[in-house]
Swiss-Prot record:
One of its GO terms (cellular component) is cytosolic large ribosomal subunit. It comes from the Eukaryota. It comes from Tetrahymena thermophila (strain SB210). Keywords: Ribonucleoprotein, Ribosomal protein. GO terms for biological process: translation. Transmembrane segments: none annotated. Belongs to the eukaryotic ribosomal protein eL39 family. It holds the Pfam family Ribosomal_L39. GO terms for molecular function: structural constituent of ribosome. This is Large ribosomal subunit protein eL39. InterPro entries: Ribosomal_eL39, Ribosomal_eL39_CS, Ribosomal_eL39_dom_sf. The lineage of its organism: Eukaryota, Sar, Alveolata, Ciliophora, Intramacronucleata.
Length: 52
């Protein structure tokens, strides 16, 4: 991908960057939740984004 990106593309990349992080520990320690990890985590080598 080149260096020139449109604003919409940058927005999408920003959103994907924010989504691609682990759960906060305080949320994991809450008593009424069964969620242990972020199942939608993405690795930059394995799964590519469908943004062109």
């Amino acid at each position: 991908m080149g260096a020139n990106k449109t604003l919409n593309m940058k927005k999408r990349f920003g959103r994907k960057i924010k989504q691609n992080r682990p759960l906060p520990n305080w949320y994991r320690y809450k008593s009424d939740t069964n969620i242990r990890y972020n199942s939608k985590r993405r690795n930059w080598r394995r799964t590519k984004l469908k943004i062109y």
